[in-house]
Amino acid sequence: MIKAENQKKRKPFTAQDTIPYKEIYKDGICRTDDNYYSKMVQFYDINYQLAQNDDKAAIFENYCEFLNSFDSSVEVQITFLNQQVNFDEYAKNIDIPEQDDCFNDIRKEYSDMLKMQLSKGNNGLVKTKYITFSIKADNLRNAKSRLERIEASVLNNFKVMGAMAEPLNGVERLKILHDVMNMDTKESFHFHYGMVAKTGLQTKDFIAPTGFDFRNDSYFRMGQTFGCVSYLQITSPELTDKLLADLLDLEENLIINMHLRPIDPKAAIKSLKSTLSNIQKMKIEEQKKAVRSGYDMDIIPTDISTYGEDVEGLLNEIQSRNEKLFELTFLLMNTADNKRKLDNIVYQTAGIAQKYNCNIRRLQYQQEQGLVASLPLGMNQTGIQRIMTTTSTAIFVPFTTQELFQGGEALYYGLNALSNNLIMVDRKRLKTPNGLILGTPGSGKSFATKREILNVFLITDDDIILCDPEGEYFPLVNALNGEVIKISAKSNDYINPMEVNLDVIYHPEKYRINGDVEDIDTIIADKAEFITSFCEVIMKKPQNAELNGDEVSMIDLCVKDIYKKYLYNDPKPENMPTLQDFYERLNFYAPDKPAAQNIANSLQLYVTGSQNVFNHRSNVDTQNRVVCFDIRELGTTLRKAGMLIVQHMVWTRVSQNRSRRKSTRYYVDEFHLLLNQPQTANYSIEMWKRFRKWGGIITGISQNVTDFLGSLAVESIVGNSDFILMLNQHSGDQKILAEKLNISKHQISFVNNSNAGEGLLFYGNVIIPFADRYPQDTRTYALMSTKPDEIQT
């Protein structure tokens, strides 16, 4: 930042003259004066306000170290830009385009719902944060090398604090300046550096407004926009980190800038000692006056005594603690469409400051200098500074509430309970997109699951598979023209557990992906592993004992016999092996192999007995985009085997889709039931670990958190889940969840006696409280509701 006394600036005659930089280069370096250069970094919010006290203290300490990392040759500007954007343009981010199918009426209704939710929050107000650092250098080359070193340090410091940050290039810096100075126009910024050479114009010509008017002493006009720059007068004896947060919560156009100039420690100590010496002289003079006047010489004016104590304390902090001194200029720029609205916004802003015993003062006859200091260029010509220590400066922690609003195939998860902003995230962007949806009965768990399924169906081409133990998903599945497969002993829907993907045989080249090869050998190996797990379930050994070596070997031998004969002899779907083939092969070896006889005896019930539902070739459309396995009527005898078979069918589908570069989403309700048995638990763990690599996204849904957390598999499941939607929880489960997921008491309060559709969203390292109040007067609500009087059949 360039101080006013160093400026010999001619009076500006054009709007471009008011914008005080010489040049902004392609790499983002800005030359503000002959010897001053700056760079700019955008950083993103973290959940400081929601963090545990220990985490808050760590962030604060790291931020203090960050401020102390700047020496007196680097001047810093921290910018908070809250800017209203055109709602219609912003709404395009969530618009769901029509497609050539029969679901456009649902798309329109869902899209309208999103726009309605968008209007509830302040998502039309885009909040961004930047840091600009400036240095003095003889030339661009010297400036560039040093600015890049500072930039690397800045990025690393933000990483330590857990905040994402990225440097801005020249076009990005110009766009920010354009948007700040052209709030009255809906025109987007279109610029590339080739336009400078083609048009003969300068970069300022592409960002300048139609004009500036600084004739009034307390406000200005920028195009058709009215603006006012004020400064924060810090009069409170003790500051709080909530002051800045409350100012940034103001749902109006607002630009806050903190200009920081570190003071050299030696110079600061020398200055303070000099000041202390002057105070001592003043004390001596006062004591002499007291003696001459005949009263006690120890009685001196309170202000001198207090001033001396303050200076001594400040000197002690610098000498004995890791404190620096900074010259701080805290500026606020409000803008509005008209003067009356501007005055109201300034009044609102002042009210927030007064709540914390501080004042907002308009810059009188300095509005132009205030505007320049409000642009992220690193220039401060106001001449208004306040000396602050590192700790007192760091109380303006630049973090408040993290938002999650992504574009592309992002899905809706409600509104941020702290800011009321729309939450839109894409699980595919996570390292491990597997997830959990946890909640007590009535918490909105099933509704949240169905809402995600519907959202996935409407905006992606992902395949969707559901395991439905309660038979509650069929209204939604039917509405999406999906396939509901009822699995029970009396059902006429059949799925063949011996079925394999013949496409591997017909088109082997499709299954060579990233060094992985799927061929006949891998098909047989995978099927042998599955049949082994299946036999472990049906043989019901005491204390869930595993199969012995002879039994495992016999299964492997029989499976190889069956599939080598089938796959190497022009395989056809109508000749697909069934459990009957496996049973017959076991009986072939049974006379000489007791292990084969044992397995065959256990298998007989499922082949020729009353539970032979799985001894048929498939007669349902397992290739439908939406498939729901309804296992509600699956009896106790078949339930474990049935759930294992469903898992295997899902894995086969994931394998097929991988070759098509297509994602598969698998939703498992009552997920804790799978973890009760070693076979299904092990299979689940394997899926959780391998799904991502194969293009699968698995979601476990559970209302019985106690059983889920008590499973030995929970560590592997949670460790491979970067997405958790946590709704209301029983008090006993809250403590366990807080320990497992390392969340604070304040965070856990959002799932304590919370209403339906409210809770915590875990997305990677981000934790956000959410609330979803889905409009009930819609067709989609009726499809997703699980309330008895609202269920649509």
Where are these regions (language model features)?
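Hydrophobic positions on the alpha1 helix immediately C-terminal to the Walker A/P-loop
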Residues: 448
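Post-Walker A helix-loop "phosphate-sensing" segment adjacent to the P-loop in P-loop NTPases
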Residues: 455-465, 480-482
